[in-house]
Curated annotation (Swiss-Prot):
It holds the Pfam family Peptidase_C54. GO terms for molecular function: cysteine-type peptidase activity; endopeptidase activity; protein-phosphatidylethanolamide deconjugating activity. Residues 454-465 have a biased composition (Low complexity). This is Cysteine protease ATG4b. Cysteine protease that plays a key role in autophagy by mediating both proteolytic activation and delipidation of ATG8 family proteins. The protease activity is required for proteolytic activation of ATG8 family proteins: cleaves the C-terminal amino acid of ATG8 proteins to reveal a C-terminal glycine. Exposure of the glycine at the C-terminus is essential for ATG8 proteins conjugation to phosphatidylethanolamine (PE) and insertion to membranes, which is necessary for autophagy. In addition to the protease activity, also mediates delipidation of PE-conjugated ATG8 proteins. The keyword Cell cycle does not apply. It comes from Arabidopsis thaliana (Mouse-ear cress). The active site is at C173, D368, H370. It catalyses: [protein]-C-terminal L-amino acid-glycyl-phosphatidylethanolamide + H2O = [protein]-C-terminal L-amino acid-glycine + a 1,2-diacyl-sn-glycero-3-phosphoethanolamine. The keyword Protein transport applies. GO terms for biological process: autophagy; protein transport; proteolysis. It is found in: Cytoplasm. It comes from the Eukaryota.
Amino acid sequence: MKAICDRFVPSKCSSSSTSEKRDISSPTSLVSDSASSDNKSNLTLCSDVVASSSPVSQLCREASTSGHNPVCTTHSSWTVILKTASMASGAIRRFQDRVLGPSRTGISSSTSEIWLLGVCYKISEGESSEEADAGRVLAAFRQDFSSLILMTYRRGFEPIGDTTYTSDVNWGCMLRSGQMLFAQALLFQRLGRSWRKKDSEPADEKYLEILELFGDTEASAFSIHNLILAGESYGLAAGSWVGPYAVCRSWESLARKNKEETDDKHKSFSMAVHIVSGSEDGERGGAPILCIEDVTKTCLEFSEGETEWPPILLLVPLVLGLDRVNPRYIPSLIATFTFPQSLGILGGKPGASTYIVGVQEDKGFYLDPHDVQQVVTVKKENQDVDTSSYHCNTLRYVPLESLDPSLALGFYCQHKDDFDDFCIRATKLAGDSNGAPLFTVTQSHRRNDCGIAETSSSTETSTEISGEEHEDDWQLL
């Protein structure tokens, strides 16, 4: 992923870095931000580009090695820096416009309901009391959105493995998107869906513990360092970009490793992880199949034979078209956000991953991992730590029709009844998909007389929609 300078607008997602401090005191932005930004913002967001590639940085290095004062401290050299940064900013702005499209922020004037990870915010249009109610609804939505955990590019962390990478700028956006989804699952499990971050109160220890798990160090269970190590067999490597399927499998491996290598008292991720795909290697065409027997087996293995059904995270990697998502699938994608179990979508534009957390009509609200922030050390014992860089107050959205077709859905089921409810909803969604299901639900696998694996659908509707008539837009994962 290329670092995106002038990312949409000067971000309101705060950072602990003094040079990148953003405004977090204002309420969530509901108006379009200006498409332009001042030179200071350009320099801040482009610092990595300038530092690594500009002739000025080379001049600084040469001066430093020769024992002279760095020439970039002179007035004329600062002028060169400004010009270089401006050129880099313009180039990356044009790149950003091509990849992600022009800046889109805030909420439209539409009164259509908003769905945010399974929670509905109904906006009514009217006078007096109805307008006041709409204001309260929007305020509640803003608070919910800004309480979601944000993961972005970081710089200044310890090298990843045997490499020299101390930053994931330019390539780590899909990994950060995956971190956001997993962090959200932990937040729902440990604090509940109704939890909201309150700046006026000391930070909750469970909340800080979650952030600590995603610190940028090998000591943190779900750091980018450990995710890359767990995903080596799926192509994960520092400096390389991977797709949603590889990231889903890597998280599955990391969660399994965490369970195997730690005792019950110190387990960081106390939920099972199950990947829903067409086959074990994810290379079967057609809609993926959620087999209830397989999920039950995953839960039994995780609980080591105990009868109590553990919480489970379901990940569904998909490829829904060629260059962009086929419009037939968009209604179903929108509907998944109405599920109480919804954890959103890992996806975005081609080559630019984001974490989509909500929908209104045909657009998706998302958290953007492309802002570059300094590393922050969070410890659960320190309730005074500044965690503002893990949250965002700026609402950004993308037209769902422009999404890259390679994406992944996430769902969190707290217990067996929750999973059963999810299966009912998913089966109905497949039945209402007009022959274009995102995935189907079956009760068990069976083999025919020729030894070929088949599936036994949990409902008649599921059987009817699992044929090949409408599978022409699917790709191999």
